[in-house]
Amino acid sequence: MQVLSSLRSAKNRHKDCIVVRRRGRVYVICKSNPRFKAVQGGKKKKG
């Protein structure tokens, strides 16, 4: 899975790619071609 600062180009790589939000991060998932998976958003500091 790639960690990207912008998912603008990642969501247009394949026709089956969809953008979802989970636990404060934005993911691009592609079930037909899993190599296009990507995530935006890193770790948050606690405290």
UniProtKB/Swiss-Prot annotation:
Keyword field contains DNA-binding: no
GO MF term set: structural constituent of ribosome
PROSITE patterns: RIBOSOMAL_L36 (PS00828)
Alphabetical list of InterPro entries matching this protein: Ribosomal_bL36, Ribosomal_bL36_sp, Ribosomal_L36_bact
Cellular component GO terms, alphabetical: ribonucleoprotein complex; ribosome
Signal peptide: none
SUPFAM superfamilies, A to Z: Ribosomal protein L36
GO biological process: one example: translation
Annotated keywords: Ribonucleoprotein, Ribosomal protein
Keyword Ribosomal protein in record: yes
Annotated family: Belongs to the bacterial ribosomal protein bL36 family.
Protein's UniProt name: Large ribosomal subunit protein bL36B
The organism of origin for this protein: Pectobacterium atrosepticum (strain SCRI 1043 / ATCC BAA-672) (Erwinia carotovora subsp. atroseptica)
Lineage, broadest ranks: Bacteria, Pseudomonadati, Pseudomonadota, Gammaproteobacteria, Enterobacterales
